[in-house]
């Protein structure tokens, strides 16, 4: 199958078959990551600009490593050392970068939908590394790969997501991707952090309690409280939040005995999850990070038209 998209902005835009292709390619890319010399010439001569208007550790570093392992030239730009601090608009920044002839711009931005705007302004490929509360497609893909690693499939699974659903781009990408692949999504969180109409996104059930959501779940994905996106306080305090929506050694038993626990990071230990669960046998958090490099290699590879991976 040929991947025909110039950009990867949202999993909503991709078909089930296209998602399967990206995951399959990522599985193959892991072989490169297991070598002593972790580099192939696939994107030699290509230039990738990582343009991050929001802070990031895992995603930015992972995209940089992914590009370098495919032999691309990678350039990192942060707002603190860009012309954005002098009032330059996103459109002008994009046009100036485009004049330097990059092949791919990987961007993270606080405004939802900013990548669609950027895509209309530039001719190179755009990959969304997170836009506001809209989507985070690479995180959704790496989560699906991590789940598939354990169960060998994605269809027929009960996936619980607990936390700040309203402000979570990870939640939206996972809902879009996992429901297309046949999983059932169960959501739990404070009513102030649950978006109205979220059930319309697919096979989604909003639960009144955390227990209802994670009861007999195959996968439990805990989400961070997005305080930087909340215009006002949406909960009394973190202790109260943890009491009702934190994952601990007792309530993790509500899920299936072989259930996997995941978190997109960064983790607030003692709030979303106790250290016992973070570091426990059911935790696949570091596996998510590991899979992130392979998934982002696959994304870069396909928006550049594919080719041979040697």
Curated annotation (Swiss-Prot):
GO terms for molecular function: amino acid binding; aspartate carbamoyltransferase activity. GO terms for biological process: 'de novo' pyrimidine nucleobase biosynthetic process; 'de novo' UMP biosynthetic process; amino acid metabolic process. It catalyses: carbamoyl phosphate + L-aspartate = N-carbamoyl-L-aspartate + phosphate + H(+). Its EC number is 2.1.3.2. Pathway: Pyrimidine metabolism; UMP biosynthesis via de novo pathway; (S)-dihydroorotate from bicarbonate: step 2/3. Keywords: Pyrimidine biosynthesis, Transferase. It holds the Pfam family OTCace. GO terms for cellular component: cytosol. L-aspartate binds at residues 86, 169, 224. Heterododecamer (2C3:3R2) of six catalytic PyrB chains organized as two trimers (C3), and six regulatory PyrI chains organized as three dimers (R2). Belongs to the aspartate/ornithine carbamoyltransferase superfamily. ATCase family. Catalyzes the condensation of carbamoyl phosphate and aspartate to form carbamoyl aspartate and inorganic phosphate, the committed step in the de novo pyrimidine nucleotide biosynthesis pathway. This is Aspartate carbamoyltransferase catalytic subunit. It comes from Trichlorobacter lovleyi (strain ATCC BAA-1151 / DSM 17278 / SZ) (Geobacter lovleyi).
């Amino acid at each position: 199958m040929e991947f025909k998209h110039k950009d990867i902005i949202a999993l909503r835009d991709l078909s089930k078959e296209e998602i399967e292709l990206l995951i399959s390619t990522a599985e193959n890319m892991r072989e490169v990551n297991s070598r002593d010399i972790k580099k192939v010439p696939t994107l030699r001569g290509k230039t990738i600009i990582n343009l991050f208007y929001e802070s990031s550790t895992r995603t930015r570093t992972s995209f940089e490593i992914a590009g370098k392992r495919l032999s691309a030239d990678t350039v990192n730009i942060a707002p603190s050392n860009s012309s954005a601090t002098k009032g330059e608009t996103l459109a002008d920044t994009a046009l100036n970068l485009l004049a330097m002839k990059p092949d791919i711009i990987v961007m993270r931005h606080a405004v939802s939908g900013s990548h669609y705007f950027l895509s209309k302004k530039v001719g190179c490929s755009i990959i969304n590394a997170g836009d506001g509360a809209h989507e985070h497609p690479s995180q959704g893909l790496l989560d699906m790969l991590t789940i598939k690693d354990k169960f060998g499939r994605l269809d027929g699974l009960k996936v619980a997501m607990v936390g700040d659903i309203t402000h979570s781009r990870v939640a939206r990408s996972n809902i879009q991707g996992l429901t297309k692949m046949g999983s059932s999504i169960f959501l739990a969180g404070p009513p102030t952090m649950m978006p109205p109409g979220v059930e319309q996104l697919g096979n989604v059930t909003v639960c009144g309690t955390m227990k209802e959501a994670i009861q007999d779940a195959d996968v439990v994905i805990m989400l961070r409280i997005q305080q930087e996106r909340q215009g006002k306080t949406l909960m009394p305090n973190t202790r109260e939040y943890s009491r009702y929506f934190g994952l601990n050694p007792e309530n993790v038993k509500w899920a299936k005995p072989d259930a996997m626990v995941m978190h997109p990071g960064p983790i607030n230990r003692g709030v979303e999850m106790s250290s016992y669960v973070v570091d426990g046998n059911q935790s696949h958090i570091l596996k998510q990070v590991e899979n992130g490099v392979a998934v982002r290699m696959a994304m870069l590879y396909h928006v550049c038209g594919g080719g041979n991976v040697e």
